[in-house]
Curated annotation (Swiss-Prot):
Origin species: Glycine max (Soybean)
Similarity field: Belongs to the Mg-chelatase subunits D/I family.
Matches recorded under Pfam families: AAA_lid_2, Mg_chelatase
EC top class named in words: ligase
Function: Involved in chlorophyll biosynthesis. Catalyzes the insertion of magnesium ion into protoporphyrin IX to yield Mg-protoporphyrin IX. The magnesium-chelatase is a complex of three subunits, CHLI, CHLD and CHLH. The reaction takes place in two steps, with an ATP-dependent activation followed by an ATP-dependent chelation step.
GO cellular component: chloroplast stroma
Listed pathway(s): Porphyrin-containing compound metabolism; chlorophyll biosynthesis
Regulation: Redox regulation; active in reducing conditions, inactive in oxidizing conditions. Thioredoxins f and m mediate the reversible reductive activation of oxidized CHLI.
Top-level taxonomic group: Eukaryota
Annotated protein name in UniProt: Magnesium-chelatase subunit ChlI, chloroplastic
Residues that coordinate or bind ATP: 116-123
EC number: 6.6.1.1
Amino acid sequence: MASALGTSSIAVLPSRYFSSSSSKPSIHTLSLTSGQNYGRKFYGGIGIHGIKGRAQLSVTNVATEVNSVEQAQSIASKESQRPVYPFSAIVGQDEMKLCLLLNVIDPKIGGVMIMGDRGTGKSTTVRSLVDLLPEIKVVAGDPYNSDPQDPEFMGVEVRERVLQGEELSVVLTKINMVDLPLGATEDRVCGTIDIEKALTEGVKAFEPGLLAKANRGILYVDEVNLLDDHLVDVLLDSAASGWNTVEREGISISHPARFILIGSGNPEEGELRPQLLDRFGMHAQVGTVRDAELRVKIVEERGRFDKNPKEFRDSYKAEQEKLQQQITSARSVLSSVQIDQDLKVKISKVCAELNVDGLRGDIVTNRAAKALAALKGRDNVSAEDIATVIPNCLRHRLRKDPLESIDSGLLVTEKFYEVFS
């Protein structure tokens, strides 16, 4: 999958920090003896709960080789990837593009749900983000893309190594974008324990799933409204808590799984439950372009890309690099962006008067407004910033009224101007 692969480069650190590329990480084993209560053990980058009174067994983490191989091969794999349509070449759909950019700048916004007509470029736009994603530092060979500097994004094993004073091998890699297919099983998403090994060898081998690969990255679900509800629940819980827990055969295994969840779908094929919609930070509505000249331009641009992808991508290289620099700069100044107290009060007043349940709407609107101010290069949020993002932050949180003909986004906009005027 092209979009799930990222390019990597070794950070400039002393050579002693790096292990030989030809050596494979050893597979560690933890023995649990019958009749003993081990409590919570941390091993192999995962948290393991031993259960008192169980027969003797071993827990093996078989994932340690996966990321090291991917990181070593990522530069070569970039050349063989399917060409991605440039983000800056997308015509129109400004609302969707803005929501995606704000989530890249501040992943804590909570993802974005994109709903719209067929053939409006939803999947193309999301996958085109891969070229704009900034590089991040990860611990070499770690299957969970642990952050070597932030304990919040560290696997348990890496955190213990840091506490012991061990120097870590670090690589620079682009943020991953992982596609979740509709036919994926819960084991493929969350990770699986090999029961056959447990029966034949007395070993329980844990193999991380897509949530581990998406840690500190983006997880994209096309046609999310057709995904099984229990899988959507798993994705949203992991995205909100930042951890994935797998319970199998008396063993509880946890690992970091903090990612930006992006879903897209066609409302004609079914809606998400309101309680699930509320868990997405922002909601973008995409419509078919009606302007004839814009439609012609889109067709011509797509034709150019299909004819010669490399030449087409090169023609947008300068715009892509400029946008990537804007994103990197916005991420670096985001923590210094301030929002005045009176603006916070007005945001909450809009939410209250619209009868928005809970406080997620207030929180997300504040975060999105700050991210937009950072993208514009400012350190203070303006009312204009709030007006731009608040429809996308609240429209999917309003209670449905079957007798209401006006779009929920317009209701939010009307209430905003009523309160802020």
